[in-house]
Amino acid sequence: MFDGIGFMELLLIGILGLVVLGPERLPVAVRSLTGWIRALKRMANSVKDELEQELKIDQLHADLKKAESKGLANLSPELQESIDQLKKAAESVNRPYKVEDTSPVAPKASPDESPSVVEAKSSEATSENSSTPK
């Protein structure tokens, strides 16, 4: 941290701080100064990390565009297999749902009705349908 500052320079800064600030305010000033330095280091590190992340994303985009321009011909077999799986999954999502069972469904019981009430209603409905003249 103090690469260019020797022991004598640090001692001189300490003595000047003691003379200017006094023994009561010097520790408080040193703590606040170190707090500011820590905050600046954290901010610089976060900016550096964000820039590195953006550069990695840009590099990935460039690699992807380069692969697309080559027609995806020189891809490894594992990567080609995963691309095929993704295409199949996308096609299955885009397909409309198939109706498997076309038989009539019995009405379901509501929470306040018992199964016997539902059976009675369904038998009434079937008897009404069969008794109506056609």
Swiss-Prot record:
Source domain of life: Bacteria
TM segment ranges: 2-22
Region spans: Disordered: 90-134
GO biological process: protein transport by the Tat complex
Subcellular location: Cell inner membrane
Pfam family, one: TatA_B_E
Protein name as catalogued: Sec-independent protein translocase protein TatB
